């Protein structure tokens, strides 16, 4: 925070953490997903933020989101669902985003997520045939399951392992598969790809 304050001063509107650090699940290899929102952002601000990040000893782990407040307010609402609920505030608040996070936004998050996963899965089955891509698609699917669970329960389940308590059917299978892959489980490419493709296909047609 001190470096941020020295760089941007009172222009800072929000600072938070996303990802494994935000959820308290970080390991030594985890990326540090910082969210920094300023009053406004110019290309010069991006360069200044880059210079600030270069001063950090763990620069290679730094990633995240850097934006002006007006851009965030006008962002695609379906993207803001995961953004809001997966961000742990350090300074400031994102609560004003709640005004756009209605059921339509969450429904759209499910639909867009399923479409992207379906395309990525079929493309990977045909062309890339990559286990790493499949793992990434299951990670993306776990976020869609969070949105599905939110629509069904009204609660955001932040930790994927806790989704097992509120999901059933294919949502539970998707979550179990993701957690298994995350812990180093063996990739069964054809079987896992088919499960993911069929699951995404269902939500494209039923959302």
Predicted regions and their residues:
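Catalytic core of pol beta-like nucleotidyltransferases
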Residues: 1-6, 10, 22-28, 39-207
């Amino acid at each position: 925070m001190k470096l941020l304050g020295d760089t941007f001063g009172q222009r800072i509107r929000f600072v938070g953490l996303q990802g494994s650090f935000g959820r308290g699940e970080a390991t030594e290899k985890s990326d540090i997903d910082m969210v920094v929102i300023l009053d406004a952002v110019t290309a010069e601000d991006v360069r200044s933020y880059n210079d600030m990040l270069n001063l950090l000893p763990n620069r290679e782990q730094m990633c995240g989101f850097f934006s002006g407040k007006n851009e965030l307010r006008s962002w695609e609402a379906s993207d803001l669902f995961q953004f809001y609920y997966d961000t742990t505030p350090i300074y400031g608040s994102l609560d004003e985003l709640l005004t756009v996070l209605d059921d339509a936004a969450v429904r759209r998050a499910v639909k867009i997520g399923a479409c992207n996963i379906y395309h990525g899965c079929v493309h990977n089955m045909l062309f890339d045939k990559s286990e790493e891509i499949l793992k990434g698609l299951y990670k993306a699917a776990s976020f869609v399951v969070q949105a599905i669970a939110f629509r069904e329960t009204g609660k955001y389940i932040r930790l994927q392992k806790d989704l097992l308590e509120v999901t059933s059917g294919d949502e539970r299978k998707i979550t179990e598969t993701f957690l298994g892959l995350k812990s180093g489980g063996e990739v069964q490419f054809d079987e896992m790809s088919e499960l993911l493709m069929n699951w995404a296909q269902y939500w494209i047609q039923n959302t």
